[in-house]
Structure formats: C-alpha cells, structure tokens
C-alpha cells in the first residue's frame, strides 16, 4: 500500500547649549533634553550623513518622546556603546523588518521610537521566547496574543507572523495610550500590564505625586524599560556621536505579501521564488509545518523581487507538483485514533 504522509555611552564631542549663568544648575532631565537638542542640531547641520531614502532618516524625522530618568538613559547608552558588537548585530537583524514596522508606526501617527521596541523586546528575533512564555518580535503572551487576534495552533503561531504581530502590537499600544494618555505609561503597561500600572498610578496619587513614569513605584525591569528604549533611540538618532555606524537600510519595502489559492510545500514555495528555504522561513516564521496553508488571516511574505518571480512561476506551475502532503481539514473535533482511521495512517 502506498504510504501517505498526513499533515495532521560615555558621551563626548559637541555642545550646542548655552553655559549656565553664574550659580545656575541644570536638572538631570534638562541635561537629557539638551542631549536630544544636540542630536537634532547635529542632524540639521549635516553632522550625520544619511540619505533621504534611508529608513533611519525617516525615523529621526519623527522621534518625539521626551526623556525620562535621564541618568538611566545615559547608563544604557554606555552599556550599548561598550557592547557595540551586540548593538550592531541586533540592528542588522532588523533589516528585513524595519521598513515595514516603521511604516506601520508612521501610518498611525505613533512616535517613531515605537519601531525600535522590538530591539528591547526580542532583539528582532522573530521566534524569541521568554521564560514566562512571551514569544515573537513583540513578545506577546499567549492570552494577550489571542485577544488581539493572533491565532495559535499546533501548525501556526501568529505571534511569530511579522505582519500580523506588528498590527496586533500597535493596536495594543494604541489602546494603552488611549487608556493612560501618555506614551511612557503605555509602554510601562505593555511591559508590566495595564492593571499593575493603574494600581501604581493610584498609589502615586494617594501619596500626592503626579502620575508620571518617574513617580511610579515599578519593578526594576519596567523602571529600565523606557530608558533603555530611549537609549536605543539616541544611538540611532546620532550614531556618530557614540562612535557607531548603522547599516544602510533603504526606506522601501523589503517584502510584500503574495496570494496562493491552495496549500503548497514550503520548499516548493521557496523554489518558485528562487530563494532558499531559510530565506523563506525568515519572513514566514509563524508556520510550524512544512506546508503553507492559506487562510484569511495568514499571509505569505516574500522579498519584493522574489515575490515577482514567485507569482510568474506559480501561474505556470502544475498544482499537483507543489504539495507532497495530504492536508486533512476536520469539520469537527476528532480523536487521533479516528483521524488515523480516516486517513489510513
């Protein structure tokens, strides 16, 4: 019988702010904001060379978050500079995803800093998993992911879907911003949970304090969360000031979605696109099986040129040669024994 496979920074350099009058001092926050003005002026005067078509130039044009806990920001800047190999490696890893993420952030008129959040969450590792079960670029917990429409099955994990998870994360962040009215508090809630932040706000208000990020009693991870993001923002904003060089990433799509009408082997899809299987999986990490099964909320993503190649080859291909598995879609709950009986496995 034929066997049937069944798919059941120490900062040096320029100074652009006036010296204080005799006896005048600056607060740490004023110093932090002065550093941001330094970055902006350096950009305006061409100190940072970046083409207009660079994704970094577009990000810099929409950085807008004020600094919080400047002493922590400075500390994380120094750490990233001293670990420059890690910083460069992580930024390079963002290459396939940065345009898409930054473009989606810009469409929603969100601060450009949000596009750098996966640096903190996952280091742009699409299948990163935390010890508590969060997973993906945006580190969704299973329940939160499902709440924001990310399907999770034995065959597919939407938390690893680049497009779907980015959309879900931005929806979640916009909800949190609407709830708290402040991006630093929204980010704190993304990390710590909205209930925890709400309770911390009430405790601060009961103590007569303004409900700001700096005034909330938070765990160390959340206390450092936004300062760490702002440190990454500052390094991206003015890499030369920190002795760094960012990889050139064009402000244009790296990938696009293609439509398929029937299941096909992942290796066949890669072959039709003239790319390696590893290149295919880098953009489609949500799939846990060797078959791509089209569904309304799932997309196949391919590098732009490869997408054109795929579509041309897909139109000319024989569908029978693209799938080496039998795909069984049950219409109701079924036991493994019954499934084996029905499929002859």
Give the residues covered by each predicted segment.
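Extracytoplasmic/secreted proteins, especially bacterial periplasmic and envelope-associated proteins
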Residues: 75, 89, 93-96, 100, ...
């Amino acid at each position: 019988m034929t066997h049937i496979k069944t798919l059941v920074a120490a900062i040096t350099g320029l100074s652009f702010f006036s010296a204080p009058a005799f006896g005048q001092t600056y607060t740490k926050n004023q110093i932090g904001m002065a550093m941001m003005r330094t970055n902006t002026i350096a950009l305006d005067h061409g100190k940072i060379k970046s083409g207009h078509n660079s994704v970094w130039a577009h990000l810099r044009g929409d950085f807008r978050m004020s600094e919080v806990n400047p002493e922590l920001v400075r500390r994380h800047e120094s750490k990233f500079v001293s670990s420059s190999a890690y910083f460069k490696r992580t930024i390079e890893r963002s290459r396939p995803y940065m345009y898409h993420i930054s473009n989606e952030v810009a469409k929603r008129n969100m601060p450009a800093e949000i596009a750098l959040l996966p640096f903190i969450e996952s280091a742009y590792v699409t299948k990163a998993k935390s010890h508590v079960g969060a997973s993906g670029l945006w580190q969704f917990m299973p329940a939160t992911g499902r709440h924001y429409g990310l399907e999770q099955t034995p065959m597919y994990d939407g938390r690893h879907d680049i497009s779907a998870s980015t959309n879900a994360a931005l929806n979640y962040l916009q909800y949190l911003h609407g709830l708290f009215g402040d991006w630093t508090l929204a980010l704190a809630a993304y990390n710590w949970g909205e209930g925890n932040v709400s309770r911390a706000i009430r405790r601060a208000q009961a103590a007569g304090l303004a409900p700001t990020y700096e005034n909330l009693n938070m765990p160390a991870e959340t206390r450092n969360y936004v300062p760490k993001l702002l440190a990454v923002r500052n390094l991206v904003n003015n890499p030369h000031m920190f002795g760094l060089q960012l990889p050139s990433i064009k402000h244009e799509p790296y990938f696009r979605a293609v439509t398929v009408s029937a299941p096909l082997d992942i290796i066949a899809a890669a072959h039709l696109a003239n790319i390696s299987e590893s290149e295919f999986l880098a953009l489609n990490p949500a799939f846990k099986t060797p078959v791509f099964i089209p569904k309304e909320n799932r997309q196949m993503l391919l590098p732009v040129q490869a997408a054109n190649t795929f579509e041309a080859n897909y139109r000319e291909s024989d569908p029978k040669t693209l799938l080496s598995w039998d795909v069984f879609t049950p219409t109701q709950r079924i036991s493994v024994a019954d499934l084996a009986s029905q499929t002859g496995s």
